[in-house]
Every structure is written in structure tokens, then in C-alpha cells.
Amino acid sequence: MATRAQPGPLSQAGSAGVAALATVGVASGPGPGRPGPLQDETLGVASVPSQWRAVQGIRWETKSCQTASIATASASAQARNHVDAQVQTEAPVPVSVQPPSQYDIPRLAAFLRRVEAMVIRELNKNWQSHAFDGFEVNWTEQQQMVSCLYTLGYPPAQAQGLHVTSISWNSTGSVVACAYGRLDHGDWSTLKSFVCAWNLDRRDLRPQQPSAVVEVPSAVLCLAFHPTQPSHVAGGLYSGEVLVWDLSRLEDPLLWRTGLTDDTHTDPVSQVVWLPEPGHSHRFQVLSVATDGKVLLWQGIGVGQLQLTEGFALVMQQLPRSTKLKKHPRGETEVGATAVAFSSFDPRLFILGTEGGFPLKCSLAAGEAALTRMPSSVPLRAPAQFTFSPHGGPIYSVSCSPFHRNLFLSAGTDGHVHLYSMLQAPPLTSLQLSLKYLFAVRWSPVRPLVFAAASGKGDVQLFDLQKSSQKPTVLIKQTQDESPVYCLEFNSQQTQLLAAGDAQGTVKVWQLSTEFTEQGPREAEDLDCLAAEVAA
């Protein structure tokens, strides 16, 4: 509602009237000089909408004043792990057997008597038949050729002109180790040398970077891995010492050493062999032979010391006169030992190669005292039992057959390999393989009629006597410049592998073809016939 005032003339006393109006409100009535009364009027409502809101629009925003949720975690301080294992096998299912009463014993006996003669006759025919000779089931891929898998070397040793003098495979067949030294003329007693090993099963194998390297103060001439400890290896030095290393210890690999005492060899050590202690198949001793004529047995005691437990001496006057022997070129009474091989059938029986060229059959059980004045902390005994016909020069290597108790091979400077029977002095056969020296010969661990020889002309010769007894089946060229091959070893665990070391300081690992790794039919019988025919 709006109030509207009617206009009218104001009197001179207008100001007083206004005051009266303000005080009283409405005049009692119109009159001259008085204003008209105030009246109420109802007018229409006018609305003006907001244009600003339409332009700006309405915006909504959602805000949160609550903090993020609190992260919690639960942990058990005394949790228990439970593992269930069942060790009891399932109860065996009883085999259903018919009661004995259901068998007709008399009729069964009559049937067996009736067919016995016919079955025996057929079995005899099958036994004498050769229909399936040569039949074999081949579960692996056939390897047709001999190939070189690895060419290994140690550049610092090769830079010094050192030769690979010995090779050995460890008990697992995965690691091959070599000794560096010199086998030619000269005084190498003060020359620093090395023992190196490569793990062929490593994916990151580096042929010129051995897995283990041991620096040795004197030239190493021979090496042999422990039969059961894969990282233990024994070595013989030019100085006459025998040492044992643990190749898994990179900082200080030396385990034991003989030291330079009265018991130590006075000449270079030719070969070392691990032997089980009598009565302790899990404990081993180290046997060493040298050109001073002594055969010594060492046992590791305490920390770092090899102690002499048994000793033998080869004296010319005590050798059995089984054959005519040449006089020792220097007129000495001691006979220098150059190689040794133990029988696979008698752990006390061994063959020695000598500087005089004649092999000796010896025994660790010998009790006769040696007629020598060489100093020793233990009594020295004379081990020789039998003397065989000699080579034309010193023997460098001998190897006993793993398949026949009486057969062994020898190789020497005359370039011949002799096959001997322990039952007679003359060799069963003599093969001239080279016009130069033969430094090593080894019998195959899987083929009774196969052996390998290393020559001074840089080759490795593989012989299969079942095919030919006069020429090698395979000739492997180890060195292109005909540098001598000084050593070789079959791998008894991975029988397809053969390692050979040469004068260039290189070790080559050869993969043999299938014909050298799988035994043929009647091969063992043929070896028996070879020994029996000539020895008869």
C-alpha cells in the first residue's frame, strides 16, 4: 500500500501546522489555511528482476574440509610357519593271488617237463646267434666328427713362453685345469708359473680369462684334481715340492705344501696322484714320483703342512732281472721315475715309467728295505716286482687299462706306444706313431680298444684297435706350427670331451665323435682275446 498526499496551499502558519501535524497526526477537519487530509491508496506492485544473476549464472562448487583417511597396517610379531610333510608312503595295494588250491600242481609239472627240452634248445640257439650283433639303441644325437669346442689360454703365461705341462679334469667333469711350466732345456727353477682353471659350464665363459688363477714360485710340471673334492688340486714343482690348492679360495688358495726338507724330492716332480687311505675310503693321500728315484706318500696335517707317511726308492741293484737292462747313462744307483699309473683292479699295484725306458710293476705293499742312503724321516722300501722290456729312450707316460687287469700302455721318446701285459716282459704290440717324442698316452674311459697319444709333432692321435692296430683312426691337428703337444686327458664324466695342452700355452677341448664314446658289441671280449692270444 502507498500513501499519497493531496497538494494544497499552505498558510502563513504552515510551519506551525506542520509541527502540529507531526505531533497530532491528522487534522480534525478541513478548513481554510489547513492542509487536506492524508489518504491511503492501493497501487500495483512493480517488480524488477535481477539481470546480474542471469548474466553471471549460478555456479556450484563442492568443497571438503575432512582430512584424508588414516592408513593403518597390521603386523604379527610372533607369527608361526607351518609346513606339512608326508613321509609315510601309501599303503601297498595287496596283490591278488589265487588260492593255491586252484592250481593243478600235477598238470603244471607235467607241462614244464614236456616243454623243458624245447625251451633249452631255443635258448642255446639264441645265445650262439649273431643276428643282433652291432644293434644299439641310440638315445642321443650322433656326433660324426671330432670338433674343437674351446681354445683356452692365459695370456700372461703365454707371454712368458710357458708351456702347458699337465691337464686335469675335476670330479664333476665341468672344470679343466692346466699347469704352466717348461719341458725343454734350461734352468727354470726360479721362473714364476701359474695354475689356471676354467669352468666350462659357466654361461659367461671367457676362453682367455680363467675362472681361477694361482701364481706359483716355481714351474709346475704335473697336476691332479682330488677324486671327490671338486676344487682341490695337487701339483708337483720343478723345485721338488708338492703343493695342494683349493681353487675356491681366491685370496689364499694354498692348503698344504711339503716345504724344502730332507723328505722333499731333490729333482723335479714328474707326476702326482691321489690315493685313498687304507681303511678310509673318504680320506686321500698324495703320491708323488720324481727323477730322484723316490716314490713318496704325503698326508695333509694341521694347517698348511704335508707330512711324509710312506716312502719308496728305486735302486738299480734291487730291480728284478726280468729282462736285459741297459746301464743307467750316468752310472747312478737310483732309477729316475718319470710317470706312474695305478691299476683299476688292485689299488696297491702301479706301473712306473723310468728314465731308462723300462716300465716297472710295483706294489705299495712291498716290505723289502731299499738299499739307499738318501735321507728320509720314514724307512724307504723297494717297490719293484717286475721289469718289462724297454723302449728306445725314456718313458714319458704310462696308462693302465680300465677294462683289463693285466694290460697297460707306455709312450716314450722313441715315438712308440707299447701295449704290455703284466704277465710277460715283452710288449704285446709296438706301434710307431711318430718320428718325434710321444709325451702322453691315455686309455679311453669308455672304449676298451681306444686310446689317445700326444706327439711332439703337434698332433693328437686316436687309435681304435678294433679297426686297425697300425695306423690311427683319427689324427687331430692341435698346433698349426707343429709345436709339441705335451699332455692330454679324457673326461671320465663327460666322456665326449678330450683336453690337450701344447707348447704354445694353449688348452684345446675336443668333442669326440660318437664312434669314440659308445662301446661296440663284443669289444671287451676282443680285448680279452688280444691279451690271451699273445700271452699264451
Curated annotation (Swiss-Prot):
<comment type="function">
    <text>Acts as a negative regulator of the Toll-like and IL-1R receptor signaling pathways. Inhibits the MAP3K7-induced NF-kappa-B activation pathway. Inhibits MAP3K7 phosphorylation at 'Thr-184' and 'Thr-187' upon Il-1 beta stimulation.</text>
</comment>
<dbReference type="GO" id="GO:0097542">
    <property type="term" value="C:ciliary tip"/>
</dbReference>
<dbReference type="InterPro" id="IPR001680">
    <property type="entry name" value="WD40_rpt"/>
</dbReference>
<dbReference type="GO" id="GO:0005829">
    <property type="term" value="C:cytosol"/>
</dbReference>
<feature type="modified residue" description="Phosphoserine">
    <location>
        <position position="15"/>
    </location>
</feature>
<dbReference type="GO" id="GO:0097014">
    <property type="term" value="C:ciliary plasm"/>
</dbReference>
<dbReference type="GO" id="GO:0016604">
    <property type="term" value="C:nuclear body"/>
</dbReference>
<dbReference type="GO" id="GO:0005930">
    <property type="term" value="C:axoneme"/>
</dbReference>
<keyword id="KW-0225">Disease variant</keyword>
<dbReference type="GO" id="GO:0036064">
    <property type="term" value="C:ciliary basal body"/>
</dbReference>
<dbReference type="GO" id="GO:0031965">
    <property type="term" value="C:nuclear membrane"/>
</dbReference>
<keyword id="KW-0677">Repeat</keyword>
<keyword id="KW-0966">Cell projection</keyword>
<dbReference type="GO" id="GO:0005813">
    <property type="term" value="C:centrosome"/>
</dbReference>
<dbReference type="GO" id="GO:0005737">
    <property type="term" value="C:cytoplasm"/>
</dbReference>
<feature type="repeat" description="WD 1">
    <location>
        <begin position="215"/>
        <end position="255"/>
    </location>
</feature>
<feature type="region of interest" description="DYNLRB1 binding">
    <location>
        <begin position="106"/>
        <end position="131"/>
    </location>
</feature>
<dbReference type="GO" id="GO:0005814">
    <property type="term" value="C:centriole"/>
</dbReference>
<keyword id="KW-0853">WD repeat</keyword>
<feature type="repeat" description="WD 5">
    <location>
        <begin position="480"/>
        <end position="520"/>
    </location>
</feature>
<feature type="repeat" description="WD 3">
    <location>
        <begin position="390"/>
        <end position="430"/>
    </location>
</feature>
<dbReference type="GO" id="GO:0042073">
    <property type="term" value="P:intraciliary transport"/>
</dbReference>
<dbReference type="InterPro" id="IPR015943">
    <property type="entry name" value="WD40/YVTN_repeat-like_dom_sf"/>
</dbReference>
<dbReference type="GO" id="GO:0045503">
    <property type="term" value="F:dynein light chain binding"/>
</dbReference>
<dbReference type="GO" id="GO:0045504">
    <property type="term" value="F:dynein heavy chain binding"/>
</dbReference>
<comment type="subunit">
    <text>The cytoplasmic dynein 2 complex consists of two catalytic heavy chains (HCs) and a number of non-catalytic subunits presented by intermediate chains (ICs), light intermediate chains (LICs) and light chains (LCs). Among them, a heavy chain (DYNC2H1), two intermediate chains (DYNC2I2 and DYNC2I1), a light intermediate chain (DYNC2LI1), and a light chain (DYNLT2B) are unique to the cytoplasmic dynein complex 2, but a subset of the light chains are also shared by dynein-1 and dynein-2 complexes.</text>
</comment>
<comment type="similarity">
    <text>Belongs to the dynein light intermediate chain family.</text>
</comment>
<dbReference type="InterPro" id="IPR050687">
    <property type="entry name" value="Dynein_IC"/>
</dbReference>
<feature type="repeat" description="WD 2">
    <location>
        <begin position="264"/>
        <end position="308"/>
    </location>
</feature>
<dbReference type="InterPro" id="IPR036322">
    <property type="entry name" value="WD40_repeat_dom_sf"/>
</dbReference>
<keyword id="KW-0206">Cytoskeleton</keyword>
<dbReference type="GO" id="GO:0005929">
    <property type="term" value="C:cilium"/>
</dbReference>
<dbReference type="GO" id="GO:0035721">
    <property type="term" value="P:intraciliary retrograde transport"/>
</dbReference>
<keyword id="KW-1186">Ciliopathy</keyword>
<dbReference type="GO" id="GO:0060271">
    <property type="term" value="P:cilium assembly"/>
</dbReference>
<feature type="repeat" description="WD 4">
    <location>
        <begin position="433"/>
        <end position="473"/>
    </location>
</feature>
<dbReference type="GO" id="GO:0005730">
    <property type="term" value="C:nucleolus"/>
</dbReference>
<dbReference type="GO" id="GO:0005868">
    <property type="term" value="C:cytoplasmic dynein complex"/>
</dbReference>
<comment type="function">
    <text>Acts as one of several non-catalytic accessory components of the cytoplasmic dynein 2 complex (dynein-2 complex), a motor protein complex that drives the movement of cargos along microtubules within cilia and flagella in concert with the intraflagellar transport (IFT) system. DYNC2I2 plays a major role in retrograde ciliary protein trafficking and in ciliogenesis. Required also to maintain a functional transition zone.</text>
</comment>
<feature type="region of interest" description="DYNLL2 binding">
    <location>
        <begin position="80"/>
        <end position="93"/>
    </location>
</feature>
<dbReference type="GO" id="GO:0005654">
    <property type="term" value="C:nucleoplasm"/>
</dbReference>
<keyword id="KW-0963">Cytoplasm</keyword>
